[in-house]
Structure formats: structure tokens, C-alpha cells
Amino acid sequence: MMHIDSHQHFWKYDAREYGWIDESMKSLRRDFMPEHLESELKRNGFDGCIAVQARQTLEETRWLLELAGRHAFIKGVVGWVDLRSPELRLQLESFGRNPKLVGIRHIVQSEPDHRFLMRPEFLRGIATLEEFNLTYDILIYTRHLPVVSEFVARFDRQRSRIDLPD
């Protein structure tokens, strides 16, 4: 059986791009790259990890896929695409059905509308995501759980995973 760290971030730290890393998380205010992690994973009996986006940009998704292509222990990438965009299909196709792209995540917890998941343009995006056989990582706070129940009921074939930091 393979043991995988299912949620790992990589970044070259820049305070302007990672404003969410506040004073309470100051230990994260440094670079985190694959070469910093691989030996730790091995030492602790892990075979690899899933790299998860920390910035909501297509460039971040491309960069994580490049890292995954260079480091075999990165078994997959949960990236970002604009699930509300009329260009969503083109964004997804631009990754060429890369086998390392295993899922998509939108930082719902930062959206001011607590019912963001139920917006029509977002629902259309999730329906498109389903066609590409990618998981959807639902990053929320506890207060969003009632909406998540409604959301997942609409997509019974869509594989989803809840990220609940609180």
C-alpha cells in the first residue's frame, strides 16, 4: 500500500503573493520546495505527496505540474482554474490532460458570499470539471457546511474532498 501526504504546498515565499500567511503562521514565511520535503517524507514512511495550489492562478497550476514532472515523489497536483470563466474548458484543455493533474481547488473560504458554491456560473464550472474526471477540493470554513451539503447533492458523480482548516 502506498502512503501519500495528500496536501502539500510548495512556494517561493513572497509576502505580496501569500498575504494570507499572517503573523500567527510566521514559520511559513520561507521557501518550501520539493528538495525540502522529499527526505522528510522518506524518513517518515511516505511514498509521495499531492501538491496543492496556494495561489489562484493558472501560472501556479502550470508551475506545480512542472515540479511534478521533475520530482517523481509528487504523485499528483490539485491546481486552480477559474471555474466561473466562459473559457474554463480551454483552461482545462491547456493542461493537455496531464495525468498528474488530479484535482482543482477554489479558495471558497475567502469568498464574501457564503453561498458562493451555489452561484450558477460556479455550478456550470463544476459540471465541466466532472467531464474531465478531476476531483474538486472544497476549501471552506465550518459555517459553509450547510451549503456544501446542498452543493454535493447536485453533483452525485463528482468526486469531492473537503478541506476544513477550522
Question: Model segments located where?
Answer:
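Conserved, mostly hydrophobic/aromatic
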Residues: 7, 49, 64, 77, ...
